[in-house]
């Protein structure tokens, strides 16, 4: 009997989780944030339900501050695959003029991401939402179950989680409740890139190094992606060879200096990396709210 490789076991587990959700829930949806984890999750969904298409739509919570290359990639990918994409923007936040520059990262994230996600899930009537979070990313995610239950107000209680034994998942929920499902929970950042390399999965070019205009702000290399970003006194964008380990809203996402231009090179960097990929996320360093507090309020 042929033994499965590490990546084959992870793939099989993720596909099993996706099929369980479709079997147990009335109206699932897949959160598609356009990054590497979302790209892998989408690839797994295509495999899980082949030759048909995934029996659920994709949902992108758009803050309007994503990198331009992310939106181009999103639209091209969805069109090429012929998938159903729902894009939701918190129009109340837009009307209030909420931006990453006139609010703290914590308040901005709550209004344009957390509240926007709640709106989208309620308007769509979704009772299960796939997300691409992994346990190795951050300590609060490390203790979250694969089937992560939410109250009717979308709140997560880390002290009240159901046991998950072997590959058995209890999806019973009361009216108004829902779950967030994390089929990549047991993957690492290195696993993700090795799988992308193995399966030749397309990803946003921002993951690869090239000269980009950046400023150093609060110790992070912030890319000046468009003319909406106000420069502080003394700031002057300079071209540096950088790439991104994680992608979010461009004013809140720090780049890393690199010359890596392909997936094999990224894997090489991962093998010697000693810092978390989320170190470049400004929202994770905002003293106003920890990731666990954000998740309890309904964040991804």
UniProtKB/Swiss-Prot annotation:
It is an enzyme of class 2 (transferase). Belongs to the PAPS reductase family. CysD subfamily. Pathway: Sulfur metabolism; hydrogen sulfide biosynthesis; sulfite from sulfate: step 1/3. Keywords: ATP-binding, Nucleotide-binding, Nucleotidyltransferase, Transferase. This is Sulfate adenylyltransferase subunit 2. GO terms for molecular function: ATP binding; sulfate adenylyltransferase (ATP) activity. The keyword Cell division does not apply. The keyword ATP-binding applies. Heterodimer composed of CysD, the smaller subunit, and CysN. NCBIfam families: CysD, PRK05253.1, PRK12563.1. One of its GO terms (biological process) is hydrogen sulfide biosynthetic process. It catalyses: sulfate + ATP + H(+) = adenosine 5'-phosphosulfate + diphosphate. Its EC number is 2.7.7.4. With CysN forms the ATP sulfurylase (ATPS) that catalyzes the adenylation of sulfate producing adenosine 5'-phosphosulfate (APS) and diphosphate, the first enzymatic step in sulfur assimilation pathway. APS synthesis involves the formation of a high-energy phosphoric-sulfuric acid anhydride bond driven by GTP hydrolysis by CysN coupled to ATP hydrolysis by CysD.
């Amino acid at each position: 009997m042929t033994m499965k490789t590490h990546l084959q076991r992870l793939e099989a587990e993720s596909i099993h989780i996706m099929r369980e959700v479709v079997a147990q829930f009335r109206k699932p949806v897949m959160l598609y944030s356009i990054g590497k984890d979302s790209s892998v999750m989408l690839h797994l969904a295509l495999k899980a339900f082949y030759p048909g298409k995934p029996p659920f739509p994709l949902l992108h919570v758009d803050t309007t501050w994503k990198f331009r290359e992310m939106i181009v990639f999103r639209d091209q990918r969805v069109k090429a695959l012929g998938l159903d994409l729902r894009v939701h923007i918190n129009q109340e936040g837009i009307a209030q003029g909420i931006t990453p520059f006139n609010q703290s990262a914590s308040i901005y994230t709550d209004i344009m991401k957390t509240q926007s996600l709640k709106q989208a899930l309620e308007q769509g009537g979704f009772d299960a939402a796939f997300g691409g979070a992994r346990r190795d990313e951050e300590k609060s995610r490390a203790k979250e179950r694969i089937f992560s239950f939410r109250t009717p107000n979308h709140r997560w209680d880390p002290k009240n989680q159901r046991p998950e034994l072997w590959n058995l998942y209890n999806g019973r929920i009361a009216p108004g409740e829902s779950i967030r499902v994390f089929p990549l929970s047991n993957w690492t950042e290195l696993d993700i890139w090795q799988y992308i390399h193995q399966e030749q999965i397309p990803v946003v070019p921002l993951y690869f190094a090239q000269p980009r205009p950046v400023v150093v702000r609060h110790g992070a290399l912030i890319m000046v992606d468009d003319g909406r970003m106000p420069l502080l006194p003394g700031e002057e964008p300079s071209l540096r060879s950088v790439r991104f380990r994680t992608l979010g809203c461009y004013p809140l996402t720090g780049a890393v200096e690199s010359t890596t231009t392909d997936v094999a090179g990224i894997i090489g960097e991962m093998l010697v990396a000693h810092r978390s990929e989320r170190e470049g996320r400004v929202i994770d360093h905002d003293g106003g709210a920890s990731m666990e507090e954000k998740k309890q309020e309904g964040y991804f």
